[in-house]
């Protein structure tokens, strides 16, 4: 059994179909990427995964439990595209606030705040107000918050949007450290360089899963030398039924 199973997911908003019969399996411990342009259905898919949206048809199971499940949702860390931080509070106060929301025991809370701040390299900035943080620091603080309750599954929606290349590399280094501890990570991105760092990818276009496999497999099957070229290849109508790589 796969850790995450998505079966025949369909979703529409009015007449606009945003997901069209999406089927995906993700094993435990994998860093899995959802790659596609804006409007391809990536955010809708992750919101269905975490129980924020209910699909019109199909289902998602995580750890063998059908979503939405409150028990499973407590095991998920989610980082949205926009930062939900209290700018007038310090980084430490933000972490403490969310630690209480996650019901982390008081005896463990202080230690966990230090641990997550260290993972994202913000220890030296914990007592500064969030309003003084750079954009990259705010993204890293959001990542720290999503890690507070030690989730089994981390879902990140465009975590490096609007961030300069140097800080993007720093966040990816953080993600690799988190994965090394056994956490399953699902990340959405439209940046090819980031997608290449994932273990496997699902390519989405207009709500349709057009290809799936490792970056190397996708390039090999498409006969191209880059992920961008592979994505363009699989976007052709004649290729969309041939894009699954095991």
Where are these regions (language model features)?
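Catalytic Walker B motif of ABC-type/P-loop ATPase nucleotide-binding domains
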Residues: 154-158
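Conserved ABC transporter NBD signature motif
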Residues: 58-74
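ABC ATPase "signature
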Residues: 212-213
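Helix-to-loop junction immediately C-terminal to a conserved catalytic motif
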Residues: 50
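Conserved ABC ATPase "signature" region
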Residues: 96, 100, 107-125
């Amino acid at each position: 059994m796969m850790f995450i199973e998505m079966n025949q997911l369909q979703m529409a908003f009015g007449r606009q179909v945003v997901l069209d019969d999406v089927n995906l399996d993700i094993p435990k411990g994998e860093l899995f990427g959802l790659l596609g342009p804006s409007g391809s259905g990536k955010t809708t898919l992750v919101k269905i995964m975490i129980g924020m949206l209910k699909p019109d048809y199909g289902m998602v199971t995580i750890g063998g439990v059908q979503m939405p499940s409150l028990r499973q949702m407590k095991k998920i860390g989610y980082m949205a595209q926009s930062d939900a931080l209290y700018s007038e509070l310090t980084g430490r106060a933000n972490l403490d606030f969310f630690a209480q929301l996650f019901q982390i025991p008081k005896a463990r809370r202080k230690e966990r705040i230090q641990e997550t701040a260290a993972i994202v390299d913000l220890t030296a900035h914990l007592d500064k107000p969030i309003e003084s943080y750079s954009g990259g620091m705010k993204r890293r603080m959001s990542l720290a918050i999503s890690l507070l309750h030690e989730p089994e599954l981390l879902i990140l929606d465009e975590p490096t949007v609007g961030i300069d290349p140097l800080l993007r590399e720093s966040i990816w280094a953080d993600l690799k450290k988190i994965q090394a501890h056994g956490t399953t990570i699902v990340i959405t991105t439209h940046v090819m360089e980031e997608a290449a760092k994932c273990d496997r990818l699902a390519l989405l276009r207009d709500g349709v899963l057009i290809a799936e496999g490792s970056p190397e497999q996708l390039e090999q099957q498409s006969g191209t030398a880059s992920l961008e070229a592979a994505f363009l290849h699989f976007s052709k109508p004649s290729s969309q039924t041939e894009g699954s790589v095991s």
